[in-house]
UniProtKB/Swiss-Prot annotation:
SUPFAM superfamilies: Tim10-like (SSF144122). Pfam families: zf-Tim10_DDP (PF02953). Belongs to the small Tim family. Transmembrane segments: none annotated. This is Mitochondrial import inner membrane translocase subunit Tim10 B. One of its GO terms (molecular function) is metal ion binding. One of its GO terms (biological process) is protein transport.
């Protein structure tokens, strides 16, 4: 599932770059729309424009790939530093944070004296 999503993101990114390059090169090179075929001048312009765009994209990607490990390493160090500053979560509440016990001594609830006598009983193994 994750692999398919990554492929879709890659395809989307490729299509965005392709569409941007096509739009940019067309606006720069297509001067005369009176003919069905591309003129020699337009063809050379399109070839030059596309080549420049592709070379620039390759240079940017190589710079990105070379910088990415250091960026990931720096982010991991930041996350670990932030995690070290977070106070640990208490698993059992302390006596200071315990809510007060409200008891009503009705006929069915045990009293403190009855509870104390139960805690004195021997525990079986």
């Amino acid at each position: 599932m994750e692999g398919e999503q990554q492929q879709l993101r890659n395809l989307r990114d490729f299509l965005l770059v392709y569409n941007k390059m096509t739009e940019l090169c067309f606006s720069r090179c297509a001067k005369n729309l009176n003919y069905r075929s591309v003129t020699m001048e337009e063809e050379q312009c399109l070839d030059s424009c596309a080549s420049k765009f592709i070379r620039a994209n390759h240079r940017l990607m190589s710079a990105y790939v070379s910088l990415m490990p250091s960026v990931v390493q720096r982010r991991m160090a930041e996350y670990e530093g932030a995690a070290a500053n977070v106070p640990p979560i208490e698993t059992e509440p302390s006596a200071d944070h315990m809510p007060p016990v409200i008891s009503s001594h009705s006929g069915n609830s045990p009293t403190n004296k009855q509870l104390d006598s139960v805690s004195d009983l021997p525990v079986g193994k």
